[in-house]
UniProtKB/Swiss-Prot annotation:
One of its GO terms (cellular component) is chloroplast. It comes from Nicotiana tabacum (Common tobacco). It comes from the Eukaryota. Its cofactor is FAD. Pfam families: FAD_binding_2, Succ_DH_flav_C. Belongs to the FAD-dependent oxidoreductase 2 family. NadB subfamily. InterPro entries: FAD-dep_OxRdtase_2_FAD-bd (IPR003953), FAD/NAD-bd_sf (IPR036188), Fum_R/Succ_DH_flav-like_C_sf (IPR037099), Fum_Rdtase/Succ_DH_flav-like_C (IPR015939), NadB (IPR005288), Succ_DH/fumarate_Rdtase_cat_sf (IPR027477). Disruption phenotype: Reduced alkaloids and nicotin levels associated with a lower putrescine production. Occasionally, an early senescence and a lower viability of the older leaves is observed. Signal peptide: none annotated. Binds 1 FAD per subunit. FAD binds at residues 98-101, 120, 127-134, 298, 458, 474-475. Involved in the biosynthesis of pyridine alkaloid natural products, leading mainly to the production of anabasine, anatabine, nicotine and nornicotine, effective deterrents against herbivores with antiparasitic and pesticide properties (neurotoxins); nornicotine serves as the precursor in the synthesis of the carcinogen compound N'-nitrosonornicotine (NNN). Catalyzes the oxidation of L-aspartate to iminoaspartate. This is L-aspartate oxidase 2-b, chloroplastic.
Length: 648
């Protein structure tokens, strides 16, 4: 029997270790262990993470301009310029990401210290802002927490952690009330009560929404509160490069993060007592995704390089209904991300047809259009492959025009912009990468195996979603875990101190300006080509339906592509400590793609979002989360922290 050990943790007994291959050769080495087998009692999700891995403790408001020194109600924020001109900023809390999880957490911890919110683009540019459907919560007397729990567990193919599900479904209603108290405005019915929608996989109406722009309204309300808070400082256009960690015996400790300003190219170091990763998902490992352009897996990759435990990366959710541009009367120019057609369209009675206007969902599942997302996405994929077509049709035109326009104004406007009236014509739709159900493994308070590092939102794997996320549970999970991470973070801050000499503990990343514009442009151009190649490999071999032979092909081709890209960089004068936004995004995409493929290869069954023709059935013995343990034997540039020892 093999034994896997997470950094700083006790032993976990496995039936077998699983390997990630070395990116610089054919010889496999133990890069990480992936747990699938063993008894359920040996790896109870909540107790394992919360105990064994417990750490010691609309329009948007204009973003405030961040200067060198600021004042807050708690005194001066320290900002130091080093002799080489580099800048270090000191905070009690650093939050990476400005979506619902990061902002909600920041507003709470700001009552106890200074907070830096680091965001890659503009503050509102997050997956939250693109969320259409809503937030699920038990707010109707006819509904129950038990019913919400059961729907979540069934949708998750019985891989969910029951305690996590109970916590989220129980605490969700209060988190919604807090949002409303903060100024978020949701739709109400004629009776004055919240208008609750129903979506696929839900047995009751429990979706709180703001038309089909729920995320935008939540983001607006949270940003408004954040910009009014003197203890919160938002750093827009700051791209997080790597977490700053040290090894203390068997423990790994996080001290902050290195960033690069995406416009000035200045490298800025943030030192803090607590860091929250709330950086979103990894949709752009695929060519078509509903995620914003910032979703390149930065948080998951940084955490993996920092020796955090990663889990369930094989479960990539493809939303069944993204707008198929080629089916529109007026085909738009290329989009950076696919336009989502919310689950609520099917929840309100939308019907799926093939291009011959034949309804097909009842052939696949008795719940038809209201089946969970994994079922609907696979059904559409099957139709497209059998019929040789590129999209299917989602029809809501049989519903009253006024109802359609009031419930889905954003979708109606987008389609009309390209010549399609959804009140009279069906909508062309196709599956697109949408949500990562895996991520950085977290306990019930958002804690990780890295001291001082907490996670919330899509970057985290809490056990809520299991093998497939239930519609509208993502914003709910983010709210609940952002709030649950607050008290342990405060406790950690209260027993920690900032060492103002810490800035010199790690070598500084450097912008590659010395390469010159000509070489730099070549590197950027090649990186963009490689990015498209990686996305093509992932869609072709690691898509909705998989097989071991195709996954092995993907693993080999990704390994070769990564080696070729890194060799190209270093042959053109790139150094291991150099950083550029596109290069750093590329290393993160490679890191996450490798995690997805290795996790998929280790699961010998079909469950939820992971469907493989080699193991087409659910196996009870495989009903365990996949766990990737940290390893220090990472030889590729993409898999190493920049401040780690140089590549040999």
């Amino acid at each position: 029997m093999a034994t896997g050990i997470a950094s700083g943790c006790g032993q976990l007994h496995l039936r077998k270790p699983v390997y990630l291959r070395n990116s610089y050769g054919n010889k496999a080495h133990c890069h990480s262990n992936v747990i699938l087998n063993g008894t359920q009692n040996q790896i109870a999700w909540s107790s394992w993470v919360s105990n064994v891995l417990r750490v010691n403790r609309s329009s948007y408001p204009e973003c405030q301009v961040i200067k060198t020194n600021w004042k807050s109600s708690r005194g001066t924020i320290k900002s130091c310029q080093q002799r080489d001109g580099s800048v270090t900023r000191y905070f009690d809390f650093t939050v990476i990401g400005s979506g619902i999880a990061g902002l909600r957490y920041a507003l709470e911890v700001a009552k106890h210290g200074t907070v830096a919110v680091i965001t890659k683009a503009e503050p509102h540019e997050s997956s939250t802002n693109y969320a259409q459907g809503g937030v699920s919560a038990v707010l109707c007397p006819l509904d129950s927490v038990e019913s919400h729990m059961q729907d979540t567990i069934v949708a998750g193919a019985y891989l969910c952690d029951k305690e996590t599900v109970r916590v989220v479904c129980t605490e969700g209603p209060e988190r919604i009330r807090e949002l409303i108290a903060m100024g978020a405005s949701f739709d109400h019915g004629e009776d004055g009560n919240l208008d609750l929608a129903r979506e696929g996989g839900h047995s009751h109406r429990r979706i709180v929404h703001a038309a089909d722009m729920t995320g935008r309204e939540i983001e607006r309300a949270l940003l408004e509160a954040v910009f009014k808070n003197p203890n919160i400082h938002v750093f827009q256009h700051h791209f997080a490069i790597d977490l700053l960690t040290t090894q203390d015996g068997s423990d790994i400790v996080c001290h902050g993060v290195d960033t690069i300003h995406t416009e000035t190219k200045e490298v800025i170091r943030f030192i803090s007592k607590v860091t929250l990763l709330a950086s979103g998902g990894v949709g752009h490992i695929y060519p078509s995704t509903t995620n914003p352009t910032v979703a390149t897996g930065d948080g998951m990759a940084m955490a993996h390089r920092a020796q955090a435990v990663i889990s369930n990366m094989e479960f990539v959710q493809f939303h069944p209904t993204a707008l198929a541009d080629e089916g529109l009367p007026n085909i738009p120019s290329a989009r950076e991300n696919a336009f989502l057609i919310t689950e609520a369209v099917r929840g309100d009675g939308g019907i799926l047809y093939n291009l011959d206007m034949e309804r097909f969902m009842p052939m696949y599942d008795e719940r038809a259009e209201l089946a969970p997302r994994d079922v609907v996405a696979r059904s559409i994929d099957d139709q497209l492959k059998k019929r040789g077509e590129k999209y299917v049709l989602l029809d809501i035109s049989h519903k009253p025009r006024e109802k359609v326009l009031s419930h889905f104004p954003n979708i109606a406007a987008e389609c009309l912009r390209h010549g399609l009236d959804i009140t009279q014509q069906p909508i062309p739709v196709v599956p697109a990468a949408h949500y990562m159900c895996g991520g950085v493994r977290a306990g019930l308070e958002g804690e990780t195996n890295v001291q001082g590092l907490y996670v919330a939102g899509e970057v985290a794997c809490t056990g809520l979603h299991g093998a497939n996320r239930l519609a509208s549970n993502s914003l709910l999970e983010a709210l609940v875990f952002a709030r649950r991470a607050v008290q342990p973070s405060i406790d950690h801050v209260n027993v920690s101190r900032i060492d103002h000499g810490a800035s010199s503990w790690w070598p500084r990343p450097v912008a590659p300006m010395v390469l010159g514009d000509t070489v730099l442009n070549k590197v950027i151009c090649r990186t963009r080509e490689v990015r498209k190649e990686l996305q093509s490999i992932m869609w072709e071999y690691v898509g909705i339906v998989r097989s071991n032979s195709r996954l092995n092909t993907a693993e080999k081709r990704i390994r070769e592509l990564e080696l070729e890209w890194e060799t190209y960089l270093f042959q053109h004068g790139w150094e291991p400590t150099m950083v550029g936004v596109e290069a750093c995004e590329m290393r993160n995409l490679f890191c996450c793609a490798n995690l997805v493929v290795s996790s998929a290869l280790s699961r010998h069954e079909s469950r939820g979002l992971h469907y493989t023709t080699d193991f087409p059935h659910v196996e009870e013995s495989e009903r365990l989360p996949t766990v990737i343990f940290p390893s220090q034997r990472n030889n590729s540039w993409s898999s190493r922290q920049l401040h780690a020892q140089p590549i040999s």
